[in-house]
Design a protein with these regions (language model features):
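Short glycine-/aliphatic-rich beta-strand segments at the starts of folded cytosolic domains
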Residues: 152-168
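Short glycine-rich or small-residue beta-strand-to-loop segments that form or flank ligand, phosphate
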Residues: 1, 52-57, 130-133
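Glycine- and acidic-residue-enriched helix-capping/strand-helix junction motifs
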Residues: 2-12
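Short amphipathic alpha-helix segments
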Residues: 166-178
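N-terminal small/polar loop signature for handling phosphorylated ligands or for N-terminal nucleophile
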Residues: 16-66, 72-73
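Short glycine-rich anion-binding loops that position phosphate/pyrophosphate groups of nucleotides
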Residues: 1-2, 58-61, 137-139
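Proline/glycine-rich low-complexity loops and linkers
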Residues: 38-41, 66-154
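Flexible, glycine/charged-enriched surface loops at secondary-structure junctions
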Residues: 28-29, 99, 156-161
Length: 178
């Protein structure tokens, strides 16, 4: 949806700011297609390269939400109904509302831990150093608090913007001395 231009990304800026506030510097960002092999290959590459990997999107109830299956494949783990996720959705939805599509959101790779979703209840999950969260910005933002207990960062990066009203080239030398 982002690659097609139909949806504008709102998660990246929020995630980068949030990570900086807890002392974790965002190093690389990728936007990839909803294609299993691409997700598997990308996750396998990045999880070895970085302390933490965050994915957003692809864990909902529709046919093209394939992130959970792809993450399971990346970790060579079975995708199974998580009893805790099922209990959460059973408590949140009436029986008539708990459709097969919604039950898809209870399928988590074996060995993964749930990441709480205080907004719409369907949880994300964490497996090793990979955090898998919803793509809807409000839901993803809520899930970050549940992920926070698994993260350790350094000192928060502080920054401040100032308006200078002159070309960058005029102050480039001074900036390089900072």
């Amino acid at each position: 949806e982002i690659l097609s231009g139909r949806t504008q990304d709102k998660n990246l800026s929020y995630l980068a700011t949030w990570l900086n506030e807890i002392g974790i510097q965002l190093t690389e960002v990728r936007v990839i297609r909803d294609e299993e092999d691409e997700i598997v290959d990308t996750v396998n590459l990045l999880r070895k390269k970085y302390d933490y990997v965050f994915t957003t999107g692809g864990i909902g109830p529709t046919h093209d939400d394939i992130t959970s299956e792809s993450i399971a494949k990346a970790f060579n783990a079975d995708l199974e109904t998580n009893p805790q996720a099922l209990a959460i959705l059973k408590e949140y939805y009436k029986d008539s509302e708990l459709t097969e599509a919604r039950l898809k959101m209870t399928k988590i790779p074996k060995g993964a831990e749930l990441v709480e979703n205080p907004v719409s209840k369907a949880p994300g999950f964490k497996i090793e150093n990979v955090f898998v969260m919803a793509g809807i910005p409000k839901i993803m933002q809520g899930m970050l608090e549940g992920a926070k207990i698994h993260l350790s960062g350094g000192k928060p990066m502080k920054s401040e913007s100032i308006d200078v009203f002159m070309p960058e080239s005029f102050i480039a030398e001074e900036l390089s001395n900072l």
